[in-house]
């Protein structure tokens, strides 16, 4: 079953924090009794509230306040993993590291991680947290068949060599690596609803590439999304993929990955 749930303080629509509130309500529907079997993570680092301390940053004040708010929204005593969501060039990395360490020592998180840090930034953060004795276990980067910056940067190699897991987000590249855009733009898709940034990327070249990948997936007895997740998991640095969904069937289809060719099958590399 699915036991890992990844959130962030700024996730949600129509307002920041609503995803955590919704998750808290879901826990109340019979899941809270299984808390010890769940891995719940959240993040903070992007703009969250008005004012000088609610903007994008990695300060001690912001991170601790943000996690306290997240715990209240989810009605939890602690999270399993707390991530600094994005590298902040305006805050000394030492301050961010000390904030993460304090959060663990206060019992508000069991482990800490970082997100959107490159290999060099990850190495420096690991050095600081190792000196503090803080359980630093993961980096959360964007990674997919269409975005291989993790490999170009050497982050995956560093992670394997130093015992850090990569929990990758956008493994389906914002929905491109699914069957959604193979034959036009559905009206209920992100592009169909007017997402300009995604719409600019969906050109003829990308559609042709997606159709070729879909043909390969069919030969493997998989959907395009299942093959895309398999591709991510073939990288030994990747410990989990974080796949969002707007419909229940999307979750079910992705879970069927484990009934098709091995997710560690390297033939899609």
Residue spans for each PLM region:
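Single conserved hydrophobic/aromatic residue that forms the stacking wall/gate
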Residues: 258-269
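Beta/alpha (TIM)-barrel catalytic core signal, keyed to glycine-rich beta->alpha loops juxtaposed to Asp/Glu
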Residues: 87, 91-257
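Active-site mouth loops of central-metabolism enzymes
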Residues: 50-61
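Glycine-centered flexible beta-alpha turn that most often forms the glycine-rich phosphate-binding loop
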Residues: 5, 79, 112
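Active-site groove signature of glycoside hydrolases
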Residues: 74-89
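N-terminal binding-site loop/beta-alpha segment at the start of enzyme catalytic domains
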Residues: 1-38, 105
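Hydrophobic residues in well-ordered beta-strands that form the structural core
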Residues: 6-7, 41-42, 114, 168
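Short, acidic/polar
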Residues: 59-72
């Amino acid at each position: 079953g699915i036991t890992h749930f990844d959130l962030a303080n700024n996730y949600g629509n129509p307002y920041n924090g609503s995803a955590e509130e919704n998750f808290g309500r879901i826990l109340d529907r019979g899941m809270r009794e299984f808390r010890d079997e769940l891995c719940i993570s959240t993040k903070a680092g992007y703009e969250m509230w008005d004012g000088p301390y609610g903007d994008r940053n990695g300060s001690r004040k912001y991170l601790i306040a943000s996690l306290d708010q997240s715990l209240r929204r989810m009605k939890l005593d602690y999270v399993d993993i707390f991530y600094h969501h994005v590298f902040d060039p305006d805050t000394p990395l030492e301050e961010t590291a000390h904030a993460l360490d304090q959060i663990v020592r206060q019992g508000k998180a069991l482990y800490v991680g970082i997100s959107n840090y490159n290999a060099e930034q990850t190495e420096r953060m690991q050095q600081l947290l190792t000196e503090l004795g803080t359980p630093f276990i993961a980096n959360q980067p964007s990674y997919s068949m269409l975005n291989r910056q993790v490999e170009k940067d050497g982050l995956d190699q560093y992670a394997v060599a130093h015992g850090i897991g990569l929990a990758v987000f956008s493994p389906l590249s914002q929905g491109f690596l699914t069957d959604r855009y193979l034959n036009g733009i559905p009206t209920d898709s992100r592009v169909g609803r007017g997402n300009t940034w995604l719409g600019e990327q969906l050109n003829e070249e990308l559609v042709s590439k997606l159709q070729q990948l879909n043909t390969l997936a069919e030969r493997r007895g998989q959907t395009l999304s299942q093959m895309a997740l398999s591709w991510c998991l073939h990288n030994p640095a990747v410990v989990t993929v974080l796949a969002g969904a707007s419909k229940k069937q999307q979750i079910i289809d992705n879970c069927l990955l484990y009934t098709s060719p091995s997710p560690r099958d390297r033939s899609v590399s």
